[in-house]
Amino acid sequence: MLGTVLLLALLPGITTLPSGPPAPPFPAAPGPWLRRPLFSLKLSDTEDVFPRRAGPLEVPADSRVFVQAALARPSPRWGLALHRCSVTPSSRPAPGPALALLREGCPADTSVAFPPPPPPSPGAARPARFSFRLRPVFNASVQFLHCQLSRCRRLRGVRRAPAPLTPPPPPPPSRCLPQDEACADTGSGSAEGLAADGPHLHTLTQPIVVTVPRPPPRPPKSVPGRAVRPEPPAPAPAALEPAPVVALVLAAFVLGAALAAGLGLVCAHSAPHAPGPPARASPSGPQPRRSQ
């Protein structure tokens, strides 16, 4: 009986186990467009040169830093807008002490300068560049530059107004960062303008190592009104002539020889005589008489 029940349970289609809904599929991996960076933020201590660095930029305090923001992959369909930039002692762009550099693409610090824009690539947006002086505002050896950027999509099939016969006068020079035409809110409907607090803002952060150069040694204190006279150099020791040296050596040799001879004579005269053997009696002398 038990074997029959087990056999029926193993047969397909006769199991009494409840069949639930099928399990949902495992979420697929994100597409390649999610893994690729949209922007690049580079720092340099030299204008127009932004090499790839293995570590953070290292600059002395109160020196100029050059910044370049660009699209990671240039495309004729996208434009770039640089909205805000600031320097903080924290790696997180949280509200707190910060040195504001840019607001809405305009300088917020007197040291911010915009170099002439580089020549654009065919069909690509120009990178945004500016420079600032890293003043010693924060007492931190590592500081962080935070920049907010946005990407604007160019619309296709938009008709542009015909160019006038007489060119208009050049616009006055702007003190703000020139934005790409796709991100400039011109109101002509040819592009999509983005506000500074829009949902398409991206914040990029780059660390900066700040070094403090050693001050030069201080000069000695001097009495006011008196000029400090340089100390004369110490005279070099004069070289000895060979003739006096030879005479001194000969005199020392003669004195040493005379002293040795005198000591030898003194020792010879003051030494005691050695005792000799006892004297024998001569045979011719008187002999003792024999007793009878």
Swiss-Prot record:
The keyword Nucleus does not apply. The keyword Electron transport does not apply. GO terms for cellular component: plasma membrane. Expressed in pituitary gland gonadotrope cells. Residues 1-16 form the signal peptide. The chain crosses the membrane at residues 245-265. It is found in: Cell membrane. Residues 17-170 form the ZP domain. GO terms for molecular function: glycosaminoglycan binding; transforming growth factor beta receptor activity; type II transforming growth factor beta receptor binding. Expressed in gonadotrope cells, acts as an inhibin B coreceptor and regulates follicle-stimulating hormone (FSH) levels and female fertility. This is Transforming growth factor-beta receptor type 3-like protein. It comes from Homo sapiens.
